[in-house]
Amino acid sequence: MRHRTMRPKTLWWIGCWAFWVGTAWSGPQREEHLADAVRITMSSAVADLPPPTPYLPTSSDDQAYQQWLAHTQAQLAKKLQDKRGQWRLPELATPDLQQAFLQTVWYESHRAGLEPALVLGVIEVESGFRKFAVSSAGALGVMQVMPFWTRQLAHGDASVLFQWQANMRFGCVILRHYLALEQGGLHMALGRYNGSRGQLAYPQAVLAAKRRWQP
């Protein structure tokens, strides 16, 4: 289905971001007709963004989460530093920012029934963790969400996709939707997410990254 034309103001604003932050690897997610029940379910899933505070009912759950957070933050910090020890991305240049980012990953992935390692793999391949990434196809943010999703599921303001939590909320809900369409087939669902269904390069890259993020 052909994408609708975005408003000139939105295109100008996104173009400015593209100039400053460069492009990311993302094919065009296909805009599709959603059955009313699916659209309502997905719209409900992306609505209401409470603080991404983990629900940890037992002390063992809390301990497992703290171990995951410490281990993953150490991995992330190592990945984000260059050979001189300088931070590559200002939006993730402090331990507090890294922790907030990972807390959001944990919350949004579990909320959608996805593994945090899978979501981190998608983020690494799609945007290289760049909060303001813009692909040549027009996908935005860390999970490279196409702007038409904000129109189909929410208020139509694509600028929210440059916010960590909103971007991950959309990205995780969309990936869960594609998994349902593909009856749990992860390779095909990832292909749909990237706009390259049936091709191997993208799913293999994400799954390789996923393995690196597993505890």
For each predicted feature, which ranges?
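Substrate-binding/active-site groove segments that recognize
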Residues: S136-H155, G171
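Cell-wall glycan-active module
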Residues: M1-E124, F132, Q152, A208-P215
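Catalytic and substrate-binding regions of cell-wall glycan-acting enzymes that process beta-1,4-linked
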Residues: V142, P147-R151, L181-P215
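A glycine-rich, coil/turn loop motif that links secondary-structure elements
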Residues: S136-A139, L161-F162, G195
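Outer-membrane beta-barrel translocator domains and adjoining extracellular loop/strand segments
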Residues: S135-S136, P203
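A short structural micro-motif
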Residues: V125-F129, S196-Q199
